Amino acid sequence: MVIIMQFYKEENFKEMHGLRVPEDWEVVRIGDFIKYIKGKKPAVMVDEELEGYYPYLSTEYLRDGIASKFVKITNKEIIVNENDILLLWDGSNAGEIFLGKKGILSSTMVKLEQKNKIMDDLYLFYSLKLKESFLKSQTKGTGIPHVDKKIFENIKIPLPPLEEQKQIAKILSDFDNLIGTINKQIEVLNKAKKGMMKKLFTKGVFEHKSFKKSEIGEIPEDWEVVKLKEVVDIQSGKYFKYSEFCENGVKCLKIDNVGFGKIFWETVSFLPEDYLNKYPQLVLKSGDIVLALNRPIIGGKIKIGILKDIDEPAILYQRVGRFIFKSEKIDKQFLFYLLMSEYFKKELSKLLIGTDQPYIRTPVLLNIKIPLPHLEEQKAMAERLKSIDNLIEIKRKEKEQIEKAKKKIMNLLLTGKIRVKNLNF
């Protein structure tokens, strides 16, 4: 038997509990059929996987699939099974919805369960995902924001016939599987890049026949070892008062805008346009390399970025450092990749001050020693790493297009504007 899904546009709607849905659909309220179980703070948690320990379901693990904390099972923890529905209850991203993995529920999350099984679980997950932005916008609390219980319980979910729920969930799940495949391809490329970086920054890209021991390990005979301050300086940005910011104007590049190898503008603060003339020394240009000076290492990754044309104009904020090149002996792209290397991360981590908000002092940072090949080899090394980055970017854009398509069809299917049914042959 061959099963083909048929899509068609719905023409007949009704109003129900404030929602416009197809005539053969119902509408249910979250509080009427969902119960939630709050996570607990674990008694014993370690950094490595041991027998009798489960992964701790942090948001980082649920997003990227890499477990970093493990909890000892004492039968007091809340166990999560694969594909359980989880809601981040507390924190800056409160309201985010996750599909669970086998592990221990974190203290900032709740596990959602149906009191009476009226809905396909995967359909419920996607329906809640559609409400995620709204839920995030309605959090409350002056300190640590949390989900507003009344608002959450009052959310209305359209309810198609069970078979259609499963079909909708299957379609959206297929999108997610495709996105997951691309994520794995990106992961493979990132691992290849990491391995290449380790080799390039110790062996080089040219065929070197002789090597020497140095303060930073074995390197090719014709390489130098220099302190960062011999080739670059670091400029820290300026603090601006809250009253100086405005709704529109020139972007202010803060620590939150410095990602792991790129610049992000998901949250943007603006300063008046005339600040470009008022503070010309703080104006950032395409090609500038910036580093977070507070919490420069998060999750084992360095918060560093290089500005592109699209990022201009922007003004440098406090505790973000811009590298100022003062020597022609070093290539800008080479330094960018070197600053993301395991070697540099290790050296930087030794010099951080503090635990809650670790930071680096610029004079200390500039004393870090780095390998310095001849300029021609630096450029060749950077070119090889750039070629992998280009492949990663192609995959990232491919993923972005699929996510856009999924978002569009998700909205159409979950509101009943487009219907789906199986044709059996």
Curated annotation (Swiss-Prot):
Keywords annotated in UniProt: DNA-binding, Restriction system
One Gene Ontology term from the biological process aspect of the record: DNA restriction-modification system
MF (Gene Ontology): DNA binding
Superkingdom per UniProt: Archaea
A Pfam family this chain is assigned to: Methylase_S
Keyword Transcription among UniProt keywords: no
Other remarks on this protein: Type I restriction and modification enzymes are complex, multifunctional systems which require ATP, S-adenosyl methionine and Mg(2+) as cofactors and, in addition to their endonucleolytic and methylase activities, are potent DNA-dependent ATPases.
Family: Belongs to the type-I restriction system S methylase family.
Quaternary context: The type I restriction/modification system is composed of three polypeptides R, M and S.
Functional note: The specificity (S) subunit of a type I restriction enzyme; this subunit dictates DNA sequence specificity. In the presence of the R subunit the complex can also act as an endonuclease, binding to the same target sequence but cutting the DNA some distance from this site. Whether the DNA is cut or modified depends on the methylation state of the target sequence. When the target site is unmodified, the DNA is cut.
Domain notes for this protein: Contains two DNA recognition domains, each specifying recognition of one of the two defined components of the target sequence.
Protein name: Type I restriction enzyme MjaVIII specificity subunit
Species of origin: Methanocaldococcus jannaschii (strain ATCC 43067 / DSM 2661 / JAL-1 / JCM 10045 / NBRC 100440)
